[in-house]
């Protein structure tokens, strides 16, 4: 029986490249001279921490992160920006979580959407992915199109198409 998996995976190496590009840009930009703006990426915890001297520089770093994500073909929906918090010496910090995988709630929304479409397919939640099976590949392609048309708050990839 044909099937495919719906996943939401981020390439952490590309995110690391994005952070390194932003670091280089911060080092070379004139408006960041003399400011102690720092970026660090924790691959294990999949989070980016930003430390800037004021809110304006924090917003500029955020815009640079988003622009570099687009440039490196990393979907900006993977980044979950936390609140700006005060740090020592008048600095501000922000934590950015890198979302990886489909949450249980999102997976349930995906399954509900597929079942509401009345297509002859079955959807099952498996850890951080959704497996869709059906008798016809055309039905599976219709499901892919249906899911692409809707926004679930996370970027979706469709892998392991088997017939």
Swiss-Prot record:
SUPFAM superfamilies referenced in this protein's UniProt entry, alphabetically: YajQ-like
Keywords: Nucleotide-binding
Disulfide bonds: none
Gene3D superfamilies: 3.30.70.860, YajQ-like, domain 2 (3.30.70.990)
Keyword Transport carried by entry: no
Function: Nucleotide-binding protein.
UniProt name for this protein: Nucleotide-binding protein Dde_2479
Organism for this UniProt entry: Oleidesulfovibrio alaskensis (strain ATCC BAA-1058 / DSM 17464 / G20)
